[in-house]
Amino acid sequence: MRNFILISFILLINVPDFYSQQDAIIWKKAQKLTSCLTTDQKIAQTCQVTLDALLKVDANGQVIKPIEIDQKKCEKLIEQQQIGSVLNVSTHTLTREVWNNLLNTIHSAYKNGKTVAPVLYGVDAIHGANYVVGGTLFPQEIGLAATWNPTLANKMGEITAYETRASGVPWNFSPVLDLGRQPLWSRFFETLGEDPLLASEMGAELVKGYQGTNPAESTRVAACMKHFVGYSLPRSGRDRTPAWIPERLMQELYLPSFKAAVDAGALTVMINSGDVNGTPGHINKYLITDLLKNKWGFKGLAVSDWEDVRMLHTVHKVAASQKDAIVMAINAGLDMSMVPYNGPHEEYLNLFKEAVSEKKISMKRLNDAVTRIIYVKLKLGLYEKQLTPWNEYPKFGSEEFKNAAKDAALESITLLKNENEVLPLKKSEKILLVGEAADNLIFHNGAWTHTWQGEDTSFNTKGAMTFRASLQKEFGQNLMFEKGYDLSSVNGWEACQIENKEKVLQNASQADKIIICLGEMPATEKPGDVKSLNLCEEQQELVKALQETGKPVILVLLFGKPHIIREIEPKSAAIINAYLPGDFGGDALTEIFVGKVNPSGKLPYTFPKYDGVIEYYDYVNSESKTNKLDAKPIDPQWPFGFGMSYTSYSYSNLKIENLGAEKFKASIDVKNTGPKAGKEVVQWYITDEYASITPANKKLRHFEKISLEPGQSKKLVFTIDSKDLQFVNSTNEWIYEQGAFTLKCGDQSVSFEMK
């Protein structure tokens, strides 16, 4: 078996300079502007505070509503202390006009010559402009991944940028590029699924959509890759807790999506709040400086997450003092600290200055950090004196944007089961719809929607239709609705109670078919920690009672993460996974249910069957063995990439041709053999039959989503070269090895040899 080390592979060596001549000019300008600053001014550029630090508060220190800038605080922090960045929304979503007034007030200090640099403002607009009243809300990233359609990711990024910049905010803390391989994690719904290729392609398109070709345009924002890197695999499943990731797997699984985003031009990165292999992300010099900045050529800024520099001392216990924490983080390559409170920010400024005076942080490192910050500000056009007024964005909340969000929801919805073609529904049928999740937008959107946790129903988008409201328009009096259960949070944990079970069953007796929407309370970060993936007993009990009626029961899963439904799946006639589809998920679900649109979503993760077993599609051969006669060794509820349709597709004529020079051309014919037009995700997998490191069962190497009319067929071609056969070896080098391989596509497979 012959090894080939790929000396030029992107994850291991210095990459070419992808930045244009114009970027080089901007970089030199940033260096010049940095050189004109005093040490105090430079340090202040690295400090980021939350909006609340600038707002008026009452006698108890609570922000006064409606919010208003405290001019004295603004003068102190922005004009006198020259703080470089502000973030966040205060309490809840704001109108464009309010946002614009806030940003203009903050920007006026620079406009009037009272600061040396404009303030860089950032928010978490992770599934649309979710902190702007009337913003277009898309599916959460896990649903976006289920579309397997990079074009939709680009469109979501473009619209989110337009509507976020309409508020005046130029920096978006998105996309999340962490892999979704720990479903217990509270932020699983923010990921692009379990596969690095899928996450890379979808994530790169989000970046391109956010930034366009010129981030300084008034319709673009700076993207922020997060959370670099390994944050999403906590051993405990709880947020901000340790991960153990071998370097080989870090290279092969967790870094590629970030590398793809760097190649797409991402301007900023947010660092992992947790620790990996005992090293907190914020002091990992190898990852931040050696790899990201030096080897990958990343020229943008690296920002901490919320209070994470302080936590090096208070939580991680790797720094003996706050000063040590600052020294360790900045020297590791951090450029900006999300401090973020008024008061602690002064301690940060003072301790940072002491560290520079004591030569614990070099002026070279400080200059580099500030140059990166100013570079991003220049790239965004923030040195222009005037912000674009909020009312000069005619497409904000437009039908065009709403239709794009609905298209994303439509292509995300995944049909997992459809016995006896119980779907689509007929309008003549009497339908019982059950479930609180069907009748409240908070269960369609999840966290990061109008508020941090997304629980406050008072800010639900006016005019957006729940699944219940949308289905009612189609079925009129033929639709009955019962809430069925009540979800709430008690002491921080999700609680559920069955409501009016007798009434639910009474209406079930009058129905031809029953739809029950299952849901979870919206939550993220530490408030979203869970102890189990099991669906709550109350919802399961209600489903079982409805199944006992003998009527066809259809499950709709409105979950940000998979929940265990093993006990209720067998007697369910149909199951649809809607993820968290956004404000237009209700309309999208209705169009799927009545057959106006054919479902085309595919699972972006392996759907688990058992609470204690986490499986991935790229398992190794030893995991496929068992001595249990009545058990399958690999037994998910549904596999990665699975999704059904109202039509059928056939795969045929899989062929592979050796092109020489270590390249092969693969081709396959895909035909719509059913009665309806549809979209199919053609997935190409390669198996390395024997390797020096235990090979995966298969690896996704290419995918393409195509549209086919009934009877139509298309020939698809995939060119395979050495990079499609690579893996990371025992010395953490990307290599490929000559030998036998198997290409799989649909139900077809073909063997080939790389010589």
Please describe what each predicted stretch is:
Residues 18-726, 733-745, 749-751, 755:
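Glycoside hydrolase catalytic-domain context in secreted enzymes
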Residues 1-24:
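Bacterial Sec-dependent N-terminal signal peptides
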